[in-house]
Amino acid sequence: MRLVHGKDAVNALDVSWLSPILVRDPTSPSESAWDLFATFMRTRTMKSTATNMNQHPTTAQICRRFATRLFRGTVSIRPLTLTLGCLAASASASLVAQETATNAAASQADAISKCPVMGNPAGPNRHTVSGAMGNGDWWPNQLNLDMLHQNSVKSNPMGEDFDYAAAFNSLDLAAVKADIKELMNTSQDWWPSDYGHYGPLFIRMAWHSAGTYRVSDGRGGASDGTQRFAPLNSWPDNANLDKARRLLWPIKQKYGSKISWADLMVLTGNCALEDMGFETFGFAGGREDVWEPQKDVYWGPETEWLGDKRYSGDRDLQNPLAAVQMGLIYVNPEGPNGKPDPIAAAKDIRETFGRMAMNDEETVALIAGGHTFGKAHGAASPDGNMGVEPEGEGLAAQGLGWINTHGTGNAGDTITSGLEGAWTSTPAEWSHGYFENLFGYEWKLVKSPAGAWQWTPTDENAKGTVPDAHDASKSHAPMMFTTDLALRMDPEYGKISRRFHDNPEQFEKAFAKAWYKLTHRDMGPVSRLLGDSVPEPQLWQDPIPEATFDVIGSKEIEQLKQKILATNLTSSQLVSTAWASASTFRNSDMRGGANGARIRLAPQKDWEVNEPAELASVLTTLEGVQKEFNASRKDGKQVSMADLIVLGGCAGVEAAAMKAGHAIQVPFTPGRTDATQEMTDVESFEPLKPIADGFRNYQGHNADRPAEEMLVDKANLLSLTAPEMTVLVGGMRALDTNAGAGPLADLGKLTKRPGALTNDFFVNLLDMNTVWKQSPMCEHFFEGRDRESGNLKWTASRVDLVFGSNSQLRGIAEVYASEDAKEKFVKDFVNAWTKVMNLDRFDVNDSESTETQVAAK
């Protein structure tokens, strides 16, 4: 999706290309060179660069002299600082190009255009802006592997060794909260607070940070602070939240690296609720910031704001999307596509909130609780009054957007959603006024000053019951959105709303728990949560019990591996079962994984991809090993099924490596425990069900994308790099782990030695004596025939062939197909395997894993 920092913002600065540049600078810049650059920058402080060039003719000479030293290598400079300085100069050079076009000083204009620092090619035809033509423009169906390499340490200013958990734990959280609450009660002239309190604005900020989460793929949410970056920082639904974050900057600046933006936004939302009289359920830190826009999140097919091409048929919403329109967090408050129909709006609300992991009661509680505070802003039409979003603004705006020219541009003249007014008579205090007004009045349809549909009481006595946000001499009637009326008019929502109206304590408890779920849903298990305000584990956090026994040691590990290998289970069965257990993990919301051994439980035990009958047989055999071992121990040591399943996979890999001529020890860290069915929300786990698993050459029946794209998507959720994904696929094919029987079992099995951990998959895939053609059996299957005889040699899937077709993946495959790569292949496979097995081991440091050792037999 290139809508914000692509098509609609072709001049948006693209700094992603800086990541490969090393930031280590062993020398210092010469003072004279820096004097030149400083002089150049000082001369650019006047009204425009063009005027500056007229008044200071030596500027171009200074620029050229500095650039000459740079390119001759006599200036040594930290690349990031230099590049940003040059890019800032280049960006403002657009003014130079425009203003010097008619300037009589043609020689000076020519000097500017040729200057290596300020030269400005016409149009977005340069690699430093996102609108430049790239590979994706030439070949739009090219496999996008960038998502596998996002969030590199090279883009992270904190460095590889920064320990955020330790930094957060050193924080005086009470002092932070006190500072936040003081800030909320101190209005700033540049963006005055409504009702003298920034709390409602901060609740919206926290809500919209968390509200992008969708349960289908676990992406979105508050856990990485991406509201700071495109596209979220420029979504229409996030209008003026740039001001909320700027208001918070003094707090962030004071505490620095001890609290991330991601944590600060959620904590501030909690503080806002508390300072306005509501008792929250809890708060946990531990959200670590990312430092770049995320490339793995699909936000929709639209190319314009508020488009709804995501729907088909009878309003069928495309997966994995949850919001109804491009640029909205949830639903359109005016109703579907702006049509004020509360019943139709209820349908959208139910689907959208459901896709964000909320049931009907949680949905009503969240909407009603959130709308107890603050107001909507629609003082005038945005047309002609509202500037562009932050990503489309110029340099002088310094990252702010939606600049408002109506009246004062803020306070009573604020334009945000276009709807106008407050829901209750105490917008800066917790109350039960929302339901009192919702059921206490009859409502009629009106338009806001901005022209948006909203509802006002038919009772004239309602006028004057709501104070003005800024002028004590004014008052208003309450208002409701179409989506608010849906909570009264929809039969199911109506029942819940009336119950909450009649039982305020139930409403308060439901809102507190729903708010906690909303803001913590994507943080994973309780073991990842930091701070002393973390409540007891909730069912939606997929709880795992604490160990009530001593874990096994190295001696017992070796004994158990021998016992497992002595059963009738093959390496393929052991590896497949361990992979099925561990590969449910999603790095997006930290759910799934091998800990808990939920592969034994519904729904995972019944998923088609896990081949239920085969799985049941393997688990029964492993349970026998577990029972025998545990019964024999007198020292308190026990082995869980979660550990035994993973250990079985490790033993299978070792045996397969030995079969290929390599002795290797696969690292294994015990300590997993077994969850129960009562600890497992079946409905909540269904979205973890793989639609496709390219590592097992499995393709489900409801795929919405080519199999190779779904492989990359799964690899991203497993936090794998392209080389790790490649070596795992090659190894899994050699180990004969395909899901399915008959022809499916042989797809991609490009080896005459199945079950041996060889690099045969890559060797045979890249063999030029084989010609590949689509199979008559299925468009997703291919046949590899001998180039001369035409005899069938292999069958393969789209996933298999992409490693020879995609130039980047082929380059990696060539490494593993080389004669000198046999040992490297085994070692790299084991390292990637161990990574996947431990993805959910948040209780284990990376340093606790042993180094993989491999030797020829």
Curated annotation (Swiss-Prot):
Molecular function terms, GO-annotated: catalase activity; heme binding; metal ion binding
CDD domains for this protein: catalase_peroxidase_1, catalase_peroxidase_2
Keywords: Heme, Hydrogen peroxide, Iron, Metal-binding, Oxidoreductase, Peroxidase
Required cofactor(s): heme b
Binding site for heme b: 371
UniProt PTM comment: Formation of the three residue Trp-Tyr-Met cross-link is important for the catalase, but not the peroxidase activity of the enzyme.
Biological processes, Gene Ontology terms: cellular response to hydrogen peroxide; hydrogen peroxide catabolic process
UniProt keyword Nucleus present: no
Keyword Iron: yes
Function: Bifunctional enzyme with both catalase and broad-spectrum peroxidase activity.
PANTHER family: CATALASE-PEROXIDASE, HYDROPEROXIDASE I, BIFUNCTIONAL CATALASE-PEROXIDASE
Protein name: Catalase-peroxidase
